[in-house]
């Protein structure tokens, strides 16, 4: 399979004390990519691509992003149009809000990340149907 992807790309893996950095770094290593693991805004803004991992609660993750002054650099990077990936909680943080503590998130995608209903197996893995309520530039 051919790809136009360059392994020389500068990928910043955002370190904000709420991410599964080791597993993401290891996964990238299988593709022979060594990310820059950093909580420095300059490393985010100068990256070719950014990955925002996440484990835990949206409330504590947003507090950590705020404390490390990473909210605006992440928003600026996303609006630049360069590749950005949120993994697990990192993806949920792109929403306007999370129902965990009714926390304001990054506001890149309109909506609220909701708790799964009781009785649903967690972690919830598998295929689901995604319904787009309105057009958005990332879809």
Language model feature labels by segment:
Residues 51-53:
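Structural motif
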Residues 1-7, 44, 79, 112-139:
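Amide-donor transfer/coupling interface in amidating biosynthetic enzymes
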Residues 11-33:
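N-terminal beta1-alpha1 ligand-phosphate binding loop
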Residues 56-128:
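Cysteine-nucleophile active-site neighborhood
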Residues 47:
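An anion/phosphate-binding loop that grips the pyrophosphate of nucleotide cofactors and donors
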């Amino acid at each position: 399979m051919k790809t136009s992807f360059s392994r020389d790309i500068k990928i910043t893996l955002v370190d904000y004390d709420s991410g599964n950095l080791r597993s993401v770094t290891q996964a990238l290593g299988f593709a022979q990519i060594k990310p820059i693991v950093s909580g420095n805004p300059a490393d985010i803004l100068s990256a070719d691509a950014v990955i925002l991992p996440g484990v835990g609660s949206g409330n504590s993750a947003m507090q950590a992003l705020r404390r490390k002054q990473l909210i605006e650099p992440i928003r600026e990077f996303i609006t630049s149009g360069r590749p950005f990936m949120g993994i697990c909680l990192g993806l949920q943080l792109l929403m306007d809000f999370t129902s965990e503590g009714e926390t304001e998130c990054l506001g890149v995608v309109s909506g609220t990340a909701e708790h799964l209903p009781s009785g649903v197996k967690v972690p919830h893995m598998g295929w689901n149907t995604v319904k787009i309520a309105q057009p958005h530039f990332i879809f």
